[in-house]
């Protein structure tokens, strides 16, 4: 909790409009994270939800390809690649919906990061994550399947602010009950260390 900026401060630091609904993802920009499918799904519903934007925090070799995809899909100004951020968990509350469209996932730790920010979660139904998604009352999707991702986004974006917030609180309660926060924090700090080492390796 203490690690995270408020929604307003996080958005200010990231340069995101405080009034929009923000779909978020956090992770290395590599094919296995499935970001290209997230962009395609968002493109399919962007006109239905004009006050919604998408932001991805992370760096990686897919960055230029994802930037080109944003252009191709007509998402300029609506989808943002925010790059690598130190201690990315600080910015979780900038988002309103947490997405993890990964094609495969080892631990699914980033899913817990979203829950720690009181966010409703949409994530791939891979074995590491499915029990967490179900426990948190989130929406499981099929990896690399744009229609199921569109349906999940549409489901959450169709909710009122209060309903969406309630979904996020449900996810946070699950995290508190199932994953002791101190254990999670230690896992997270370990993740940060490995993430920073990885980022250093990936710098050109």
Write out the residue ranges for each language-model feature.
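Nucleotide-activated donor-binding/catalytic signature segment of Leloir-type glycosyltransferases, i.e.
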Residues: 67-83
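A short, well-ordered alpha-helix in the C-terminal region of glycosyltransferases
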Residues: 9-12, 163-177, 184-187
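A conserved mid-protein helix/loop that constitutes part of the nucleotide-sugar donor-binding site
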Residues: 21, 25-44, 54, 61-68, ...
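Aromatic "clamp/platform" in nucleotide-sugar-dependent glycosyltransferases that forms part
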Residues: 84, 103
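Short acidic/histidine- and often glycine-rich active-site loop of Leloir-type glycosyltransferases
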Residues: 112-113, 126-140
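Short hydrophobic beta-strand element within catalytic cores of glycosyltransferases
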Residues: 120-123
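Conserved acidic donor-binding segment of nucleotide-sugar-dependent glycosyltransferases
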Residues: 135, 139-147, 155-161
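A short helix/loop element that forms part of the nucleotide-sugar donor recognition site in Leloir-type
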Residues: 1-16, 162
């Amino acid at each position: 909790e203490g690690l995270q900026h408020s929604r307003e401060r996080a958005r200010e630091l990231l340069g995101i409009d405080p009034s929009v609904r923000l779909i978020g993802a956090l992770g290395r920009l590599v094919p296995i994270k499935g970001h290209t499918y997230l962009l395609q799904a968002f493109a399919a519903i962007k006109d239905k939800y004009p006050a919604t934007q998408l932001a991805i925090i992370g760096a990686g070799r897919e960055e230029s390809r994802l930037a080109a995809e944003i252009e191709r899909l007509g998402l300029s100004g609506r989808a943002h690649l925010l790059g690598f951020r130190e201690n990315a968990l600080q910015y979780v509350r900038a988002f309103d919906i947490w997405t993890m469209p990964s094609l495969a996932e080892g631990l699914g730790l980033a899913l817990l990061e979203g829950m720690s920010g009181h966010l409703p979660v949409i994530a791939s139904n891979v074995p590491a994550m499915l029990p967490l998604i179900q426990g948190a009352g989130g929406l499981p999707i099929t990896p690399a399947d744009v229609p199921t991702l569109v349906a999940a986004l549409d489901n959450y974006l169709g909710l009122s602010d209060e309903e969406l917030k309630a979904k996020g609180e449900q996810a946070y309660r699950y995290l508190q009950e199932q994953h002791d926060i101190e254990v999670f924090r230690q896992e997270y700090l370990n993740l940060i260390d490995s993430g920073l080492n990885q980022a250093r390796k990936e710098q050109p």
